[in-house]
Amino acid sequence: MPYDPDIHHRRSIRLKDYDYSLRGLYFVTICTHGHILRFGDVVEDAMILNSAGQMIERWYKECERHFDNLRCLDYVVMPNHFHCIFQIVETASPKERQQVPLVGADLCVCPKTPASSLGGHAGPPLHTIIQWFKTMTTNDYIRGVKNGVFPPFHVRLWQRNYYEHVIRSQHSYDEIVEYIRNNPKQWYNDKLFHP
């Protein structure tokens, strides 16, 4: 059935009028379709990646090479989801990008005016980065299925959407980093845990 806005009341979870290509820090969560466990196991409060989880990790690190305006910060691959912090920076040389501070002026604050009047675009918006990451990981996973390395998936590898949070302060950044680092320890209490 084709999309019909009168029937399919799909509500956007993005900030209205926010320009997701602006430089700043973004906390992102991407879940597997159906929350199926695909990327490894949590053993004694530590995430043990299987070959599919290692592939996800590899493609996350590859994002920086593909997008000049991107830094990949803290992340964790979990059995059925992936958390990370992307930093969109001004387009610069790799050496200049390494010198960009993590917080302070680069923290992204929600605009009070429509995005079109703000300027300051750094490059591709967040959704383009996520789409590329999902495409690369899905294609690699499909190759693994064809080679008998990964189990097949039904419909798609990832959920259609993703969750994002614009990081607006040092305190928020610190809390999110701690959340990411402690995620394996909290696995059995996680709402995404489905044995």
Annotated model-derived regions:
Residues M1-P195:
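Short catalytic/metal-binding and nucleic-acid-binding patches
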